Swiss-Prot record:
The keyword Signal does not apply. It comes from Campylobacter concisus (strain 13826). This is SsrA-binding protein. The lineage of its organism: Bacteria, Pseudomonadati, Campylobacterota, Epsilonproteobacteria, Campylobacterales. GO terms for molecular function: RNA binding. GO terms for biological process: trans-translation. It is found in: Cytoplasm.
Length: 151
């Protein structure tokens, strides 16, 4: 059973998702505890390839009140993502050539209680694309409601 610890709903609104990946993430113990307590925000976070390695940037993981002041990490620190070299090279090629973005969709606990990141290769939406998506979603919602009403 996979439990989502933090979701990036804004990424689903601003981007159209083309392909998803799973990556491990390097965290400190206090950060894992904070994630389990639901103290993370991925709203403006993104992923960059720096010197052939993936880093999660601008993700906010608050520390717990019980964390000692000497061990309180920077809340917006760059966190390294762990993937196979071939996957990183493939992603880097697509991001650099096709003009795609690499965004984080969620942080979750795997079956073995390891924190993982769900990444996505995505293409940015224009304003009219966002409006079209909202209209389509609203129409589907109304259709489902009408079917429920008359069945």
């Amino acid at each position: 059973m996979i439990k989502d610890l933090a979701k990036n709903k804004k990424a689903l609104h601003d981007f159209s998702i083309l392909e998803t990946f799973e990556a491990g993430i390097v965290l400190k113990g206090s950060e894992v505890k904070a994630l389990r307590a639901g103290r993370a925000n991925l709203k403006d976070s993104f992923v960059r390839v720096i010197k052939g390695e993936l880093f999660l940037l601008n993700a906010h993981i608050s520390y717990l009140e019980t964390t000692h002041s000497a061990f309180r990490p920077n809340e917006r620190a760059a966190r390294k993502l762990l993937m196979h070299r071939k996957q990183i090279d493939k992603i880097f090629g697509q991001v650099s050539q096709d003009g795609l973005a690499l965004v984080v969709l969620a942080l979750y606990l795997s079956d073995k209680n390891i924190v993982k990141a769900r990444l996505a290769l995505a293409k940015g939406k224009n304003l009219h694309d966002k409006r079209e998506t909202l209209k389509r979603r609203e129409a589907d919602k109304e259709a489902r409601a009408a079917i429920k009403r008359y069945v």
